[in-house]
């Protein structure tokens, strides 16, 4: 993944590496310019401005780029003179752990935690119901378990609310209302606002902190967090799907969807065995 100030010169250099029929479209709602190569050797990538990327990493406006960066990735090049991008990437990982912990019980395994984290950006994505392998998230974690450990170990050891036992692959979590309130206050502000909109009826206009305090004392606190994330992802995934059809064209979109459905059925049949 590469981020930087998007400029015509950069785009020309990127596009010069691909065939002349490479398409370019703005993926509204995420700030990502989606690029698709042509067969053979189909390649899909995206270009995003630094400011849009920072915004999503810190605020979770779309959970599109930030959600992908909850998983282990290989950063090929990073121009970050002031350290803003590095700090935002770290904040995004910390937010992912915080959100996941709010939805988990008092005791759970490493794999449960990482599966929850990897699944955050798919929560509310309609494509996970129709068109995606049902085992997609589990497969991501299973194939990259050691990378997930490396990515999140420091945050888990630093957390005052978690007892992490790497040798046993188990974690114990303080689920008191006070701890949950502290965790809710640490969530990205856009997610906090979504939670406020869900819990507060129209016209009340209560302070965000007051609403989060109420949620922290609710036995369904984790469910509210999932609903808030789902609201963000649902809007973003619909936008991405529409723009994906425009970018690829209807014929390619149908072929791509057919491949997705095939993978979905394969995953469904595998899970039934």
Task: Label every PLM stretch briefly.
Residues 1-28:
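Helical scaffold of the NTase/Pol beta-like nucleotidyltransferase catalytic core
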Residues 23, 32, 55, 59, ...:
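Polybasic/polar functional segments that serve as interface/processing modules
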Residues 29-32, 121:
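Short, flexible loop/turn elements at secondary-structure junctions
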Residues 34-41:
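Short glycine-biased active-site loop of nucleotidyltransferases that positions the nucleotide triphosphate
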Residues 42, 46-166:
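Conserved NTP/Mg2+-binding pocket subregion across the NTase superfamily
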Residues 145, 151-205:
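Active-site/pore-lining binding-face segments in mid-to-C-terminal subdomains
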Residues 179-273:
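Charge-dense, extended regions
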